Every structure is written in C-alpha cells, then in structure tokens.
Curated annotation (Swiss-Prot):
Keywords: Disulfide bond, Hormone, Secreted, Signal
Disulfide bonds: 77-187, 204-212
Statement: the UniProt record of this protein carries the keyword Secreted: yes
Entry's Gene Ontology molecular function annotations: growth factor activity; growth hormone receptor binding; hormone activity
Major localization class: secreted
Protein name according to UniProt: Somatotropin-A
Keyword Secreted: yes
Localization, UniProt: Secreted
Cross-referenced InterPro entries: 4_helix_cytokine-like_core (IPR009079), Somatotropin (IPR034975), Somatotropin/Prolactin (IPR001400), Somatotropin_CS (IPR018116)
Signal peptide: 1-25
Family to which this protein belongs: Belongs to the somatotropin/prolactin family.
Protein purpose: Growth hormone plays an important role in growth control.
GO cellular component, one term: extracellular space
Name of the encoding gene: gh-a
Amino acid sequence: MATGFCSSFGLLVVLLLKNVADVGAFPSVPLFSLFTNAVSRAQYIHMLAADTYRDYERTYITDEQRHSNKNSHVVSCYSETIPYPTDKDNTHQKSDLELLRFSLNLIQSWLNPVQALNKVFSNNLVFGSSDVYERLKYLEEGIQALMQELEDGSFRSFPFLRPPYERFDINLRSDDALVKVYGLLSCFKKDMHKVETYLKVMKCRRFVESNCTI
C-alpha cells in the first residue's frame, strides 16, 4: 500500500512539474518592466537624436543657416500633419492606448529615414557609429508588447496620412541638402522627445513609485 501511495504521489509530482514547465515556458513580463524598458529605450534614442543634431549643427551648419532654418520650414515634420498632443495638459487627457498608438506611429515613421541618414554620416558623428535603427526596432517591439498587454492581443497603429520623409536629398555636397538634413534631424529629435514624454506619462499614471515630474 505504501509502495502504491509513493508511486501515485511521484506521478502526481511529475505531472505538476510538467504543467508548471508548460505554463512557464513563455513567462509573461510584468507591466511595470515593460514600461520601464520602453521608457529607458525612448530616453536613449532621444538623447542620441539630440547629440546627433548638435554634432551635425556644429560640423555642417553655419550661424546664418542655423538662424534662417529656425525661421523657415525647410522640412515639414511628419508629426505636424497629425494632431499629436504637444503639451502636458493635452497629453494627460489621452488614454494610454492612444498615447501608445501615437508613439508607435512616430517610431514607424522614422524606420526608413534613419537607415538613409545612417549611410551619410562619417564615424565622427553620433549617427555614423550607432545602431539607431536597431534601437528604434527594439522600441517598436516594446510598444507593441505594451499594446498587446493592454488590448488583450489586438492592436492597430494609425495609418500614415502621407508617406513620411520618402523624398529628401541626402547628398551633402549641396548646401540645400545640408539644411534639409538638418531639418530632418530637428524633426527626429522633437518626435523622440514626444515618444519619451508619452511613455513617461503612462508609466507615471499607472505606478505611484515612478518619477512623475513631467
């Protein structure tokens, strides 16, 4: 009888361990960790964009070009064609899913341009020695994971209203092209700041222990 009990108990343990292994084969990542990773990635990309913009300005742009560019629209930022929240109050009025969709759309609008820009710069510029495209893809995946978590597996990004940054001259031998790329880098920096802000707002709203000084 004891032998039978031991055999049955042993079989039960094996089955329980098997079930635990099956359930834990693909463990879910806590929502806090998903937000923390996304915020960290967005912060890095925004810092990279700001450093690249500053280095490019210092290397290629004259004082006259810099001042004239600030007062003109050499390159129209794609994000200006969509009513993204641009201030603190408007951002807080949007739901987490809306902010995630905005963020995903912004990230996806830059996947092609950064590949073209990456081929232009020499290694003394931040872009030339970075893996910005890969980091954008990682952030895209992180945002999609958050959307899946909040939407129970179904999500759709906003359709592009027009092809973003499809046609721009990256021949740096031309002064006009230099200024256009300068404008693009300015747009990239602004858009990555938006993404970072949106993610921080979402994390702040959901987790009390997060830094909420936004």
